[in-house]
Design a protein with these regions (language model features):
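Conserved acid/base catalytic micro-environments in cytosolic active-site loops
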Residues: 2-7, 13-28, 34-54, 58-254
Length: 254
């Protein structure tokens, strides 16, 4: 099997070189090129035809979100966004990125190397298997599910999503009415991002959406999103309904 061809788009020379050095240590990955801004990236895409592109959001000459909006209709490819803790990452997902990782501080080299090997590399390998047309199709189909309504208060809707799933989840939730049974959602995200994602969905939909906390009740018209990181959300039966319990735990399936 040939290695995954990766293009790195990053304006920080220090972080860019760290990405190159650490990704090249894995024989399953071939870094075919780097770019400092979207204009260099455009030329590199045409020259190297990468399987996956990593993309910083904050770039000179054109930001990463605008670049994605221009790129994806003409040259769709799996893109993993590397972003600081900002809700701009969801705009990037909406523009066509398949996944994202939280950009660590540049002050600790060993932590940076661990991040690249244990988080970014995993995302790149998963992204290389993504079918962009399928992801977009699923998002469109999900947006058509607009007629699910409440039948019994004890019903619970469960949503789980990973790579490429944030925009599909958003499309589903925007189609729900306020009489939908209570929703619990597990969305694969780094710590810190789930709270921003919940606020975004709360503003965009007819539901009351929040990041879950222990003791929160699962109520019709409400949606609870499990916190990112190493915490797990568990449903607990209380009378005729449910509430959630959030506690630390080992990762399940990565």
């Amino acid at each position: 099997m040939r290695p995954i061809k990766v293009l790195i788009v990053e304006d920080s020379i220090v972080f860019r070189e760290l990405l190159v050095q650490n990704l090249r240590r894995d024989p399953a990955v071939q870094v075919v090129g780097t770019a400092r801004d979207p204009f260099e990236a455009r030329d590199a895409i045409l020259a190297y035809k990468p399987d996956v592109m990593t993309l910083d959001v904050e770039l000179p000459r054109m930001n990463g979100i605008e670049f994605l909006r221009k790129l994806m209709p003409q040259y769709p490819l799996p893109v993993v966004v590397i972003s600081s803790l900002s809700d701009k990452v969801f705009d990037a997902m909406n523009a066509g990125a398949v996944d994202f990782v939280a950009k660590p501080a540049l002050s600790n080299r060993s932590q940076l190397e661990d991040f690249i090997r244990n988080e970014l590399l995993v995302k790149i390998k998963i992204a290389s298997t993504a079918k962009i047309s399928n992801i977009k199709k699923k998002t469109v189909l999900a947006a058509e599910q607009q007629h699910l309504t409440s039948r019994k208060k004890e019903l619970v809707v469960a949503i789980g999503a990973s790579t490429g799933g944030t925009e599909a989840t958003s499309a589903v939730v925007r189609g729900f009415g306020a009489d939908i049974p209570g929703i619990v959602c597990v969305q694969h995200m780094p710590p810190g991002f789930t709270q921003m994602y919940a606020k975004r969905l709360n503003d965009e939909s007819r539901l009351q959406v929040k990041e879950a906390e222990t003791g929160d009740r699962v109520l019709p018209g409400h949606m609870l999103i499990a916190p990112g990181g190493d915490r797990h959300m568990r449903l607990v039966k209380v009378g005729t309904g449910y509430q959630v319990e959030v506690k630390p735990g080992a990762r399940v399936n990565g």
